[in-house]
């Protein structure tokens, strides 16, 4: 895939390889709407941040802009997307950003199957049924007149790719991590499995969590209970302005 460069409204430059529309949408979520801030989430000097589902690196870039002394560990399993992530970290000469070409899940698996959407790379997933209705079953919401064209143009091209996944606890063990000040998770339906990969001894090391939760099969309730059982106070915010064909998606904010 050929990486292109975009300049956003705030002057920030970055490389991307999927659609310009998706890249601008992610920028808006992170930099304009600042969806990973607020709700008692705080990024402080010297914090250790885990960016799980890093995509092309916009959240990692955002974190380093907010707090240059933060240390970021960024995880992206899809190889073509990971290569763009590398280019963006190099473009901005970011220090203390450690990149991993793997995802996080409930097990260590060198070849977990993902559905990769080259034109919508941030939607690549192990659970494509969570994110999209079948194209032929789409019922277009009146507020989204262009959605059919977007589905046709951006989601029809897809491929199955084998990617490495690891448990969060295996990474904590390998790196000797004592504290994760913020755990950010955006993994397109795999979030419950990410939490399952945390051993009991490692939960106290995690101080704050921001996660996008795809609420299917009671997943939101399961995750909320798991976090409450491990000492977190939780706030939820439902994402609006999504077509009715998408599963309900929430932003979850958890602090101790």
List PLM regions with ranges.
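Phosphate/nucleotide-binding beta-alpha loop and adjacent structural elements of enzyme active sites
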Residues: 1-256
